[in-house]
């Protein structure tokens, strides 16, 4: 339990950040344990609504891997992966779209609205928000990359104080649906919005670690060159590589900072954005 003086200190520490980030866009990729655990999910949504009420303009991009796997199993379709990427044939694509757009997205929208926010659920198909292209690996099926982002619809929503919630599914000009990595979608959206302040990736790790098995080796602040050097020396490895590359790409296109943080921590978003110390890894140019 905080004392009265500690409560005042917390509020005082947050004030400069509230002033600095007022009316600025933050793009948050949401997935992992924070999506599976109901308590963490409620806290993420509560943080999101709070940030909206104090003047920030959050955009939420989500995945939904565990829910997809649940429905594939229920329909007796065996999930397949290649180097950690979901192999997406047409039956799998149908399930991915049903789950991400029809279930996960609408549940998040309803939760935001229930907590007092105003939210609109979207997929990449809505308003031609995302134009995909095949990723070039035929064995992966309908796994896509981002070819283009049209931000007009997002700007209308955030300018009217709505929180866009985006499922990472899109369709090409022939109407073929593609499953796109949610980290990639979040990074590309942040990069295409000229006044995006932050890209935040919620993960199941503390951030970028010098020793992947030791949370105390968290690197709390680094620039693009340092991130590239750590990748070359294999300090950054495995599943962290595409996340860091996503951050680097968004920074190179004008996003002020990119953050990788542990979504399993209570109120991770508020701690990262509104405190001096933060809790994750912040990348800057």
Curated annotation (Swiss-Prot):
Reactions accelerated catalytically: N-acetyl-L-glutamate + ATP = N-acetyl-L-glutamyl 5-phosphate + ADP
The record's Pfam families line, in alphabetical order, gives: AA_kinase
Question: Enzyme class, one word?
Answer: transferase
> Where in the sequence is the signal peptide annotated?
none
Gene Ontology MF, one: acetylglutamate kinase activity
Would you tell me the Gene Ontology cellular component terms?
chloroplast
Checking SUPFAM superfamilies in the record gives:
Carbamate kinase-like
Q: Where is this site: Transition state stabilizer?
A: 29, 243
Q: Which GO terms describe its biological process?
A: arginine biosynthetic process via ornithine; L-arginine biosynthetic process
Q: Which InterPro entries match?
A: AceGlu_kinase-like_sf, AcgluKinase_fam, ArgB, Asp/Glu/Uridylate_kinase, NAGK-C
Keywords of the record, alphabetical order, are: Amino-acid biosynthesis, Arginine biosynthesis, ATP-binding, Chloroplast, Kinase, Nucleotide-binding, Plastid, Transferase
What subcellular locations does the record give?
Plastid, Chloroplast
Listed pathway(s) = Amino-acid biosynthesis; L-arginine biosynthesis; N(2)-acetyl-L-ornithine from L-glutamate: step 2/4
The residues listed in the UniProt record as binding substrate, with positions renumbered to this chain, are 64-65, 86, 179
Q: Which family does it belong to?
A: Belongs to the acetylglutamate kinase family. ArgB subfamily.
Function summary: Catalyzes the ATP-dependent phosphorylation of N-acetyl-L-glutamate.
What is the protein name given in its UniProt record? Acetylglutamate kinase
Originating organism: Pyropia yezoensis
The organism's taxonomy opens as: Eukaryota, Rhodophyta, Bangiophyceae, Bangiales, Bangiaceae
Q: Which gene encodes it?
A: argB
């Amino acid at each position: 339990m905080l004392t009265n003086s500690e409560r005042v200190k917390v509020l005082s520490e947050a004030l400069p950040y509230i002033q600095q980030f007022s009316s600025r866009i933050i793009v948050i990729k949401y997935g992992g344990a924070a999506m599976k655990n109901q308590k963490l999910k409620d806290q993420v949504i509560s943080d999101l609504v709070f940030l909206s009420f104090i003047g920030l303009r959050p955009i939420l991009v989500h995945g939904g891997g565990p829910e997809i796997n649940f429905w594939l199993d229920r329909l007796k379709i065996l999930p397949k992966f290649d180097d950690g990427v979901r192999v997406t044939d047409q039956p799998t694509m149908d399930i991915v779209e049903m789950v991400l757009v029809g279930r996960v997205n609408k549940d998040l929208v309803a939760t935001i609205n229930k907590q007092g926010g105003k939210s609109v659920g979207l997929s990449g198909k809505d308003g031609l928000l995302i134009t995909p292209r095949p990723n070039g690996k035929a064995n992966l099926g309908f796994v896509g990359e981002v070819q283009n982002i049209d931000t007009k619809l997002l700007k209308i929503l955030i300018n009217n104080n709505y929180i866009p919630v985006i499922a990472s599914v899109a369709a090409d000009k022939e109407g073929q649906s593609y499953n796109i990595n949610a980290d990639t979608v979040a990074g590309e959206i942040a990069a295409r919005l000229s006044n995006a302040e932050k890209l935040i990736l919620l993960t199941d790790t503390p951030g970028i670690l010098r020793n992947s098995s030791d949370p105390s080796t968290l690197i709390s602040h680094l620039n693009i060159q340092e991130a590239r050097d750590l990748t070359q020396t294999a300090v950054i490895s495995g599943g962290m590589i595409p996340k860091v590359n996503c951050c680097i790409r968004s920074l190179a296109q004008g996003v002020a900072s990119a953050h990788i943080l542990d979504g399993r921590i209570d109120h991770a978003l508020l701690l990262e954005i509104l405190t001096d110390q933060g809790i994750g890894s912040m990348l800057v140019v």
